[in-house]
């Protein structure tokens, strides 16, 4: 019988786009709950991942990459990321070891200097650099502000992630178990389905298309005869030309998106899935507050 006290708390993961925040959280959770691609601003909402052991529960908040916004959607994403500073117990400031400190990192650092909670510097992607460079990178960041801890990791390979979990546990206070031990995210299945479809579009399309799409899951029902889950989803674009790209020649692209998304959705749900997708044009939806709210990007939820 153990006398160890149960610890819990909320941990925000902040950083520029593409530094590996979602990769880290998916690794810790042991399955995909945050989508990934090489496109900037892949994560748009705050994604909560729940890591529970016998002695602790850490609720990770994977935030959108902080960048200079160019539309109302971008502004929503940045405000969503910064709002986590008001609701977390620890901040992980994640940077990429293979990229030099930029104005983006400097902007985040200025905000973090005002944080009233411990800030841990996480140097990710150490597998991409020579070990001798690590000291130089850490020295550069620690010259800008004081961090409570510095932990180098490779989220992709899983290197040193256990040490980071141990470090977080040390920073957290005793607290309750906020979520059931078998729950790994607070987002509903429909949200995760939409995100998995959007991920495949990010992977398969280029130029302006990835940033111009939203996905809504309109219906999820089980077919009593086949046992399959019937999902109806809508892909929203801003231009007629973008709709043509999503559909592809003879519908090739939309079929490819559906096939790849269905595979991940079936793994997540543990059931066979029939996925039906439609493409709808909504001109300039990223700058319309009503459309943003309809598609799940409601700024009031993050204020």
From Swiss-Prot:
CDD domains: Era, KH-II_Era
Cellular compartments annotated: Cytoplasm; Cell membrane
Name used for this protein in its record: GTPase Era
Chain residue ranges for the region called G3: 62-65
A single GO cellular-component term on record: plasma membrane
Region described as G2: 41-45
Database matches in Pfam families: KH_2, MMR_HSR1
A biological-process GO annotation: ribosomal small subunit assembly
GO MF term list: GTP binding; GTPase activity; ribosomal small subunit binding; small ribosomal subunit rRNA binding
Family recorded in the similarity comment: Belongs to the TRAFAC class TrmE-Era-EngA-EngB-Septin-like GTPase superfamily. Era GTPase family.
């Amino acid at each position: 019988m153990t006398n160890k006290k149960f610890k819990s708390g909320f941990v925000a993961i902040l950083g520029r786009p593409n530094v590996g925040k979602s990769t880290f959280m998916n690794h810790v959770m042991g399955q995909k709950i945050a989508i990934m691609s090489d496109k900037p601003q892949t994560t748009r909402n705050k994604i909560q991942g729940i890591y529970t052991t016998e002695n602790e529960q850490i609720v990770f908040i994977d935030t959108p990459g902080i960048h200079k916004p160019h539309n109302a959607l971008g502004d929503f994403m940045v405000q969503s990321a910064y709002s986590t500073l008001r609701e977390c117990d620890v901040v992980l400031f994640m940077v990429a070891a293979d990229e030099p400190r930029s104005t983006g990192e400097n902007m985040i650092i200025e905000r973090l200097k005002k944080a009233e909670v411990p800030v841990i510097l996480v140097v990710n992607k150490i597998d991409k650099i020579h070990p001798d460079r690590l000291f130089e990178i850490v020295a550069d960041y620690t010259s800008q502000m004081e961090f409570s801890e510095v932990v180098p990791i490779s989220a992709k390979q899983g290197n040193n992630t256990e040490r980071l979990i141990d470090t977080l546990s040390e920073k957290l206070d005793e607290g309750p178990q906020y979520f059931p031990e078998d729950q790994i995210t607070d987002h509903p299945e429909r949200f995760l389905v939409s995100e998995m479809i959007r991920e495949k579009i990010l992977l398969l399309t280029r130029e302006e298309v990835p940033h111009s799409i939203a996905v809504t899951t309109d219906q999820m029902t089980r077919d009593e005869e086949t046992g399959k889950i019937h999902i109806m989803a809508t892909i929203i674009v801003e231009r007629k030309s973008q709709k043509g790209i999503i559909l592809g020649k003879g519908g090739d692209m939309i079929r490819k998106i559906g096939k790849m998304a269905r595979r991940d959705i079936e793994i997540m749900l543990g059931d066979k899935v029939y996925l039906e997708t439609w493409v709808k044009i909504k001109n300039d939806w990223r700058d319309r507050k009503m459309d943003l709210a309809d598609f799940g990007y409601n700024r009031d939820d993050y204020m």
